[in-house]
Amino acid sequence: MKHAKKTRAPWILLACLAAIALCIVAAVTLLQPNANPKNIEIPGTRGNIPATIQLPAKSARGEELPLVVLCHGFTGNRQGDGHFAPLAEDLAANGIATVRLDFAGCGDSTEPYANYTLANMAADVDSVIGYIQATYGTGKTALVGHSMGGRLASLYPQLGQYPVTALALWSPANGTGLQGLEFLSIDNFAAVEEMAARADAEGSVAAWGVELSAAYIDGMRDSDPNATLQESGLPVLLTYSGNERILSDTTQTETKAAVESLPDGQVVLDPFVNGDHNYTSEDPATNTQLDADLRQVTVDFLTSHLQ
C-alpha cells in the first residue's frame, strides 16, 4: 500500500500542475483586450447590410453587453475615415460591443445610392440593433454618428424603433431642413435649393458623383435634428473641428446651443481646433493626435453612460 501511494503521488502532482496551467491560460485569455472584428452581412428590410462587429473578450456575468452603433457620413463607409476601427478596439477593451455598417450605396453595399435616405438609414440601424440583440444579448445601446451619420443619430430617437441611451455626434450636418445639405455648395445655398427643386421635378439629382433621390431630399427638408435632440433629452456628446469648411457657422452655433440646453449635453471643441471635418490633418503628428483625442473623449462619454 505504501508503495502504491508513492507511485500515485507524482501523477497527482502533475494533474494539479496541469489544472493550474489551464487556469492561467484561461485567465490570460479573459484579459485579452478584445475579440477580433468580424465582417458579416445582417438581414435588413431591403436585403443584406454589410457590417463589422467587434465584441469584448469577456463581459461581466449576469450583465447585458452594451452596444454602440457607428454611423458613417455622406458617401462614406464603415471605416469612418479611419476612426471607427480603432474606436471599436477601444470600446471592446472597455467591455462594449460595436457594429459599424455601410449604408445604401456606400462601401460594400450593393444597393444603388438612390436608396440612401434618412428613413432607410434608420431602418438599417433598426436591423443591426435587432440582430445584435438577438444574437449576442446586448442591452443598453448608443449611437456614434459623423456628419450625415450624426444627423441620422440625432433623428434616430424619432425615426428609429429601438430606445437608445446616449448619442455621440462628430460634426453632425444638423442644419434645419434643406440647410442640412449646405455642404453640397457651402458658398451658394441657392444652388442647393436648385438641386432640391430638380430632384422634386425629375425624381433625382446628381451631386458629389452620386444620385440623390427625391425621397432623400424630402427627408432632409422635413427633418429638424436639433429639435429632435432637445425633445429626446438624451445625454449627447458633440464635437466640431476648427476647420469644418463644409458646415456653416450657423449650423454649428445652433447645434451647440441645442446640445448645451440638454441636462447631460457635452460640447468638446478644443482638442480639434487643428482638424478638418473628418478629424484629419496633413501633418502626421497632428493627424495621430486628432484621432487619439476623438476616440478618448468618445470612449469616456460612452463608458460613463453605458456602464
Model segments located where?
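Glycine-rich nucleophile elbow surrounding the catalytic serine of serine-hydrolase chemistry
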Residues: G145-L155
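Catalytic nucleophile-loop/oxyanion-hole region of alpha/beta-hydrolase
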Residues: I42, R78-G80, C106-T138, T288-Q289
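Active-site glycine-rich loops that stabilize anionic/oxyanionic intermediates
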Residues: L65, H72-N77
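The alpha/beta-hydrolase serine catalytic core
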Residues: I49, R151, Q158, P163-F301, ...
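N-terminal cap/lid segment of alpha/beta-hydrolase-fold proteins
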Residues: V28-R61
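Conserved alpha/beta-hydrolase
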Residues: A88-T110
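The serine-hydrolase catalytic nucleophile loop
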Residues: G76-A88, F103, T250-T251
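Alpha/beta-hydrolase fold nucleophile elbow
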Residues: Y136-S147
